[in-house]
Amino acid sequence: MQDNEPKNSEGLTREDTPLAAQQCGKGINSITEYLFVNLPFDSKPSDEMIATLPDAEKNAIAKMAHFFLQARYEESAAEAKRCMNSQHPEVNTFALLAHILNHVALNNMEVVQKDFQDLRQRTQHPENKHVAALNDIFRFALSVFFHLGEATAPISPESFSHCSEGSRLYALYAQSYALYLQQEYAQALGMAEAALMMDANRHEVICIYLNVLASMAAMSLSYFDRADRFFLNALRIAKPMGYIQPFIGHHGPLQGLVEKHIRDREPELYKMISDKVMLFRHGWTEVHNPQSQDKVTNLLTPYEFALAMMAAKGKSNQEIADYLNISINTVKAYLSIVYQKVGITKRSELKNYLVK
């Protein structure tokens, strides 16, 4: 079949064109702007630094992020591999982070372990304060994402002063996530909302993640209407570009939001997300479980996991049924299957086999 879709100057179809390249007035540099700081005391501001990057490298950075957000892990990993050879530590460390996450999804754990060792070495020997700040954020974000944050030092205040606006907002997302893991749901929600107000829709990718985080916290507080609103905001931004990864990586803590808003309305999209959830969760647990007392199960389907998360977070069978528009008997049947699969008899034991 002939592809009649118009292509841009670099030979990419719209499907392959990163979000950065399609934002009017921003161009492909909008992804790299997250990595290079632009503050009054900088001797070399962001625009000048970015101008030194070859076009091919800027495009590779944007494609790496774009493919990952679309859950196209092999393609993203290939672009990350290219970017890991960059002479700029801001770029090659960011690429290493992406390389780790892609290979978690691909279940290539030997690659993941090697990359983690490399990242630890880099964080111990940063080239300058800006690179040290980015390393600090990446270190913290990875620990939070894999739910290993109990013994992790927080992001230092100094790191915020040496980062771009986009990186600072990403750091606020990570800190909000950490508060969520500490069950400080009201604080997590407040921080995410404040960051969204600061963002003012300037950074769409980060805005997706902040809305997802806010919806997680709101669900944990049983603020169902607010959770719906934040989730639908994230979906509204993400869907036109096929950015499903935020909903894959946060599926468990979203506690049924994916099921409520996507499962019946868009079954093909839900199947795509569910298939990737199973793949990604397997790799995620390979990182998380050996380093945590909580052993997250891989035995549940995404739908079973979502219902189990709602039950573990204190939702009654009636609340689950009302929220997902199913019968109480259906809820009971699914929870019975969950108990059987993980080998428990009490609702209170669920938390030992699920994400936080």
Where does each model-flagged region fall?
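Flexible inter-repeat linkers and adjacent short helices
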Residues: 1-87, 91-93, 109, 244, ...
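Helix-turn-helix repeat elements of alpha-solenoid scaffolds
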Residues: 29-47, 65-81, 104-118, 143-156, ...
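Solenoid-like repeat scaffolds
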Residues: 47-56, 81-92, 117-130, 155-168, ...
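Small side chains
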Residues: 80, 98, 192, 308-311
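Helix-turn-helix DNA-binding segment
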Residues: 287-336, 340-345, 351-356
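Linker/hinge segments immediately adjacent to helix-turn-helix/homeobox DNA-binding domains
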Residues: 141, 149-156, 167-302, 318
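Tandem amphipathic alpha-helical repeat scaffolds
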Residues: 23-38, 57-72, 92-108, 131-148, ...
